[in-house]
Swiss-Prot record:
<protein>
    <recommendedName>
        <fullName>UPF0213 protein in ldhD 5'region</fullName>
    </recommendedName>
</protein>
<dbReference type="InterPro" id="IPR050190">
    <property type="entry name" value="UPF0213_domain"/>
</dbReference>
<feature type="domain" description="GIY-YIG">
    <location>
        <begin position="7"/>
        <end position="84"/>
    </location>
</feature>
<dbReference type="InterPro" id="IPR000305">
    <property type="entry name" value="GIY-YIG_endonuc"/>
</dbReference>
<dbReference type="InterPro" id="IPR035901">
    <property type="entry name" value="GIY-YIG_endonuc_sf"/>
</dbReference>
<dbReference type="Pfam" id="PF01541">
    <property type="entry name" value="GIY-YIG"/>
</dbReference>
<comment type="similarity">
    <text>Belongs to the UPF0213 family.</text>
</comment>
Length: 98
């Protein structure tokens, strides 16, 4: 995965320390991941057992609507479907499947 630019429209997936997935949308990916890891991110990632988080996957978009639509679609999938989506997009998920 190539490094994201500092600003843009991103849909992203985090791997949490408790082996769960967190999905979000942001305009500054590096800053958002740092906020999740500092405990200042979403309520879900503020739970200490979920940190640290790792950026597992992201997609960049030309506009906010498309990034938010991708996030919405992904969040509605089952865990099994999410892992399949990630695998189909080049993420090695064998270590993340349990």
């Amino acid at each position: 995965m190539e490094a994201p630019s500092e600003n843009g429209f991103y849909f992203y997936v985090l791997w949490c320390a408790d082996q769960t997935l967190y999905t979000g949308y942001t305009v500054n990916l590096k800053q958002r991941v740092a906020r999740h890891n500092s405990g200042q991110g979403a309520k879900y990632t503020r739970v200490p057992k979920r940190r640290p988080v790792q950026l597992l996957y992201y997609e960049s978009f030309e506009n906010q609507h498309d990034a938010m639509s991708a996030e919405y679609f992904f969040k509605k999938q089952s865990r099994k479907e999410k892992l399949k989506y990630l695998k189909n997009n080049g993420v090695i998920v064998t270590t993340f499947s349990h």
